[in-house]
Amino acid sequence: MAGIKHRRDSAESINTDIITLSRFILDQQHLSAKNATGEFSMLLNSLQFAFKFISQTIRRAELVNLIGLAGASNSTGDQQKKLDVLGDEIFINAMKASGNVKVLVSEEQEDLIVFRNSPGKYAVCCDPIDGSSNLDAGVSVGTIVSLFKIHENQNGNSGEEDSEGTINDVARCGREMVAACYTMYGASTHLVLTTGAGVNGFTLDNNLGEFILTYPELRLPEQKSIYSINEGNTCYWEPTIADFIAKLKENSEENNGKPYSARYIGSMVADVHRTLLYGGLFSYPGDKKNPNGKLRLLYEAFPMAFLVEQAGGKAVNDRGERILDLVPQHIHDKSSIWLGSSGDVDKYLKHIGKL
């Protein structure tokens, strides 16, 4: 009897009613869009296939000689890694095969990709493998994605078609995103997603081949004494920014009697993931080398800002402007960024006189 009881206790400690990403997507569709066509849900499922494919490829990269440079540069002049090229191909093929994507923007492609024969109603912007320069050292990297719905015919006439796919479908205000997510490939593969109704985190179970809900309804702490910034660029910063970071390191009353702790990995996905879980401030300001900042709006700043805001935080640029209010003119336009716990971002806004 003792053996039976032990087995029963062991079984009861295992949750067998798990929520997979596919189940979560369908549940959300039934709750919030009962008349939905299912196209958006199918697109999200195509995205998770791409994430699983990239995750598996990264895990095997060193064994199949995918570590190192590919000998070319991407759209913004960064040296491409072999995995950058492969990750880009995986993403393009997955989005094309989905049949739900009309327009694709990739960091690795100089121009907009339009799937002319696709009936898709969505535009996807992505950085297939963000932080790839860290891969050789085994540091966590990730995929960042933002989703827009393409422009519908403006006159509402049944005889007129929706957009055939132009830059206008993505060169728009960040508030018009319908979803954003990132996947972090590290010790585990984590997917963090928002469709505009909060933030939820999933972990890939390699045995099941499914993303499992492990961080439901993520919320950022109001404030946390942690800052994340590349202080190797201090000599290039504007005095206002250098002064602000210096003040964070003081054990002043304003900092509750102790200095902020520095936590910087150098991979945006990993740094933002930590910030979402623990709180604090992540920043990549403009400097003398990159006055407008270095992060691309469409597939870095926009999706991360959307996620952080949906988790109760804030995201602004060096001038204190809300990231999601900005409108890019080109698909690879850049921005500075300060994001994280609302109290910590407010501290920066007060410092520059915007609060």
Curated annotation (Swiss-Prot):
Protein EC? 3.1.3.11
Give binding positions for Mg(2+) 2.
E107, D127, I129
GO terms, molecular function: fructose 1,6-bisphosphate 1-phosphatase activity; metal ion binding
Q: Which cofactors is this protein said to need?
A: Mg(2+)
Q: Which residues bind substrate?
A: 130-133, 230-233, 263-268, 284, 294-296
Q: Would I find Secreted among this entry's keywords?
A: no
Cystine connections: none
GO terms, biological process: fructose 1,6-bisphosphate metabolic process; fructose 6-phosphate metabolic process; fructose metabolic process; gluconeogenesis; sucrose biosynthetic process
**Has keyword Metal-binding?**
yes
GO terms for cellular component: cytosol
Protein's UniProt name = Fructose-1,6-bisphosphatase
